[in-house]
Amino acid sequence: MTGTSLLTNSWPLLRWFVSSATLTVPQAAGPVAFSFIALSLTGSTSGGAAMILAMTLAQIAGAVPLARLGRNLPAATMLRLLISFRAMALASITVCAAYGASFEWLVLFAAAAGLVNGAAYGFLRTLLNHFVLASRLPRALGIASTLNEVTFVLAPVAASGLATVSPLLALLAMTTLGALPAIVVPWTAAVARVEGLPTLHGKLLSPEVLLWFACAAASGATVASIEIGAVALALNFGYEPALAITFTVPLCLASVAGGIWISVRNRMASRTAVVVQLAAMALGSALAAVNHSMVMTVVGTVLIGVVLAPLGTYFSLALDTLAPPERRPELFALLRTSQAGGVVFASALLTFVSLSSALVWVTALMTAVTLAVALAPTRLNFQNRA
């Protein structure tokens, strides 16, 4: 691809980045926005947690069927349809809240909104292959990961600020921003198909694919255990709940730094590097589980955060080589679903067992997948792409 064509492709790629950054606004702002709505309607924030749970479970249920449903449509078209459906579901939540409808309707529409999240990510990630050379995918994914972390930092803050004015205003803003991918995502017809990605044919859910799904689930559970358990961690060390940011902010900043590092390096990691990164995440989780001191726990969260983007980038690149082009939306949807499954696992642990026990279980899971990758056959070690 010539320099001229790269320049031509920069505008569609920029639109893809905007779509990627705004795709997750409902997931990022939802916990805060839904909690404020639940508080205003029921007098308790627990309804907000029910809405998020419904959204997450629906995402897991809908990922594969919706990805398969859109297999014969252009990825951009299917993405627009999915995001439009989600926008209507979120708008329905706003209308129901405005008119004081039964709270069960809000939970139902939250599930409808979440139904498309996994598949939408699958189609959006597939589109990236149309706008970027294979050799530049690590950089593009690193940038996307960095923008995603920025979204998860800023969206809850914005939702909280708007909700203090009006919970409905927070919902309206979340719905509007979450609908942007349907407007700005570029059409695949606008850019020539990017070649250069090797593809391995065979079963879609091969042992290699399942291994990376397990790693994604474990990393999702590890991050969620810190984010969801942040308030409990602060209380555990005798601090006010507001100091939960002592754990979440370093986690997010370290993740942003990891995304920037991947963007600058622009290379697919070796399997040895991936094992080291997985081990670092397991060590970070172990430091938090030890419950020795706040400093040690913060160091653990930084270790988790700094390898989050490199690992996510590697999982995505590895799966690129393991599926036929027409099955990539399905595979990427399953990748996002695996991460969501990890979040559900961590949430369940924190609900039914103590914080320390939950962190021990998550550490054990992270250690198990680290050993699995370290001992896996060498065919899982894909060649670096410069």
Can you say where each PLM-predicted feature lies in the sequence?
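C-terminal ends and interior cores of transmembrane alpha-helices
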Residues: 84-100, 280-292
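A late C-terminal transmembrane helix in Major Facilitator Superfamily
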Residues: 326-356
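Helix-loop boundary and gating motifs at the non-cytosolic
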Residues: 2-60, 203-249
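Transmembrane alpha-helix termini and helix-breaking/packing motifs in multi-pass membrane transporters
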Residues: 98, 154-172, 345-361
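Helix-to-loop junctions at the C-terminal end of transmembrane segments
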Residues: 59-76, 163, 257-271, 354
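Intracellular juxtamembrane helix-capping segments at the cytosolic ends
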Residues: 34, 118-132, 230, 310-323
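Cytoplasmic helix-loop-helix junction between adjacent transmembrane helices
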Residues: 109-150
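C-terminal transmembrane helical hairpin of 12-TM major facilitator-type secondary transporters
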Residues: 272-313
